[in-house]
A protein has these predicted regions:
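S-adenosyl-L-methionine-dependent nucleic acid methyltransferase catalytic domains
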Residues: 1-165
């Protein structure tokens, strides 16, 4: 890939979030153009930053896609970066996109995170990253802006779990 065509957020390449969103919108627009009307597109995406998730959402929405379903791809072994980086995410959301407008809930992002925490039956210390992935998926499916970066969500999850104990 030519550096100019690479879709990344990079200070050294002078590519900020709006540039990233614009380039992603172009990709999703081309996907929509070639995809049959009754077909779906699956996207695997990974980020620990809410602003990047919201750029992705705007990109596929602006291109005419909506989220039909989400799930999380839980890999059995995390990458080195996922293990050593504070605020890293584990469990890449799989996003099933369809042509057309999606739903937009009036729920608040924090209410979604609270619901995911409440419905989680696992050891939170081990699974805060999976809770975050589920939170992202639920926000995408309901058309709600992602408000929590991974690190902020992990701190919030820890506080909520202390209250429960």
């Amino acid at each position: 890939t030519k550096r100019a065509d690479e879709i990344i957020i990079s200070q050294s390449q002078k590519k900020d979030v709006p540039c990233y969103q614009k380039m992603m919108t172009e990709v999703f627009s081309e996907m929509k153009r070639v995809l049959k009307d009754d077909a779906f597109a699956t996207v695997v995406f990974h980020s620990s930053k809410a602003v990047v998730w919201n750029a992705l959402c705007s990109a596929y929405s602006d291109a005419g896609f909506s989220v039909a379903a989400t799930t999380s791809l839980d890999k059995s072994q995390a990458s080195f970066k996922q293990v050593v980086s504070e605020g890293s995410v584990q469990g890449d959301p799989l996003i099933l996109l369809s042509k057309g407008k999606g739903i937009h809930s009036s729920l608040h992002s924090q209410a979604i995170l609270d619901e995911v925490i409440e419905n989680d039956n696992s050891d939170t210390a081990k699974n805060e990253r999976q809770i975050y992935a589920k939170y992202i998926g639920k926000c995408l499916q309901l058309g709600i802006a992602v408000e929590f970066d991974a690190k902020t969500a992990y701190d919030y999850i820890a506080r909520k779990m202390e209250v429960v104990k």
